């Protein structure tokens, strides 16, 4: 590449020589050998910068003239006066080309030519230097040799290659590290986990991974709640299996610790209507909450007392304080379940079993305190310890009679407290269970109440049984398909944005298929979605009848409808399926063009979306462009309708033998009498009047 540039630069010198020869033959004869010498020397010498020499010095010292016209050994630094002189020279040359010549001295011409050559050499020299440096830089990047000479780029080179000095130094440092360093960089484990697994912030309401983590924390919490009383009272923890219990406890503690250090400080929260996702703010919010204090209290290491008192599960009783995660898991799980009442029933049953479990443990502790088998009231030591105590707890809390009478004062006080707490707790749980089941069946009860009121109303006014049957069928089908009788009332309390989101998910795919609304404003389509009403028709119901005034347009959401016609009005002309539209002509027509042209009957159960004319006009007031587009489409539909109605249907049979009669001329109709024949007397009278007037 550099060789080709050198050849190209050498081709410039003869042009300069010819210019100088025109201006001064003697000067050209002196400069040509020096230029050749300068080129030969420049190939041997390295690149360097020199300051420009003046015209007088170049003629006083002939040896220095080689550096004056050299392409490699000259870097200009002209004065502002020289630039002004060059500008004036170019203007004079332009005026010379236009034909206006001015007298110029010989010395001025030689000086101008020298300045032009200096500027040309300066730019070409700078270009060659930059190309060499760029080539060396690319070569170093490709080869990546250890002893490759480094190229020091100047500020002009950095600007020309669009590489800042800071970026170039960073790239050189990186290449140096890649070449000479063989040790891989170590990433801390904490930073690795933060990048690969844990996000900076967690949305507790939408993140399912966080829900799974809460499930794991809930399992650890239930392990402590259910098994700590058993280990504390029953002789199930022995020196043989003590290590297994300790290992399980350590695993639960690790789960607690990870939840406090890694998960909870990343939970997003809302402050002033804004969702906070900053890491420092999230940590500060968690550390200032009551939840953090309870979590820290639940993880205090009281197990160090094992050294003084031995392994006793009582020192792990503080693990039960982490109840906030348990209730948070229940809340999030109920919010995503389709039938949350099922989980509520299971959870309430779990509460009841846990209370019975605690009562069984307390009864065994009281029996052990009094002495196993010492009286009839205490546990006699036969059979499975836990099952016998649990059975006694069930009979006590549910207040089932037939229990042995307490003998000692301790037994009497214990039984009194047990009965009192049992009645209170059991009645509370039964009431909560009733509320859960009642909330689960509230909609069904509402539907049944509505049906009872409607049937009572129809019986009051002696409505025929056929109509009552159809009403019952409509109510049952609507409830079974939608689980609600009126969808509009359900969404009234929601904001408009949420109503639009729900409507988009349900009906947008249907509206998008309608050819009538294609090309309309998207916001207008959104407004239409909010105004659509869903209506269910039974099999055989007339959606609209021929000749009635049309005020609604219908979009089929589910099911099919049939368009009837023919002489008797019972012939099925076409069957419309989901996504089809009918009634749009009556909705968009003006004047008397809004009459229904056919009967439309539901074929099976059909769910139709209806849009009335008044609502559409209110919407189109805000969208004039869409209104014009719909009016054009309405005209096209009306014209197509007119063509179809004006078309003469083909006659069956040999129609060519009996062609249709031509229409009677209008003038002839005037002269026809009541009998349909021409009145000759009237014709004669008219002829006489014309002759008398002439």
From Swiss-Prot:
Q: Does the keyword Cell membrane apply?
A: yes
Which Pfam families does UniProt cross-reference here?
A: cNMP_binding (PF00027), Ion_trans (PF00520)
* Annotated catalysed reactions: Ca(2+)(in) = Ca(2+)(out); Na(+)(in) = Na(+)(out); K(+)(in) = K(+)(out); NH4(+)(in) = NH4(+)(out)
Record-annotated site: Central gate: 426, 430
Q: Which residues lie on this side of the membrane: Cytoplasmic?
A: 1-210, 263-291, 328-340, 438-694
Q: What is its main location?
A: membrane
Q: Which residues lie on this side of the membrane: Extracellular?
A: 235-241, 310-312, 364-385
Swiss-Prot/TrEMBL site (Occludes the pore below the central gate) positions: 434
Q: How does it sit in the membrane?
A: Multi-pass membrane protein
Task: Quote the Gene3D superfamilies the UniProt record gives.
Answer: 1.10.287.70, Helix hairpin bin, Jelly Rolls
Kindly indicate whether the keyword Nucleotide-binding belongs to this entry. yes
User: What GO CC annotations are associated with the protein?
Assistant: photoreceptor outer segment; plasma membrane; transmembrane transporter complex
Residue ranges, compositional bias (Polar residues)? 26-40, 153-168
User: Which keywords appear in this protein's UniProt record, sorted alphabetically?
Assistant: Cell membrane, cGMP, cGMP-binding, Ion channel, Ion transport, Ligand-gated ion channel, Membrane, Nucleotide-binding, Sensory transduction, Transmembrane, Transmembrane helix, Transport, Vision
Per the record, the domain of life is: Eukaryota
Regarding tissue, the record states:
Small subset of retinal photoreceptor cells and testis.
Q: Which SMART domains match?
A: cNMP
What are the boundaries of the region Cyclic nucleotide-binding domain? 522-638
Q: Where are the transmembrane segments?
A: 211-234, 242-262, 292-309, 313-327, 341-363, 386-412, 413-437
Q: Where is this region: Ion conduction pathway?
A: 340-439
| Region annotated C-linker, chain positions | 442-518
GO biological process annotations for this chain's record? visual perception
Biological function: Pore-forming subunit of the cone cyclic nucleotide-gated channel. Mediates cone photoresponses at bright light converting transient changes in intracellular cGMP levels into electrical signals. In the dark, cGMP levels are high and keep the channel open enabling a steady inward current carried by Na(+) and Ca(2+) ions that leads to membrane depolarization and neurotransmitter release from synaptic terminals.
Family of the protein in this entry: Belongs to the cyclic nucleotide-gated cation channel (TC 1.A.1.5) family. CNGB3 subfamily.
Q: What is this protein called?
A: Cyclic nucleotide-gated channel beta-3
Record gene name: Cngb3
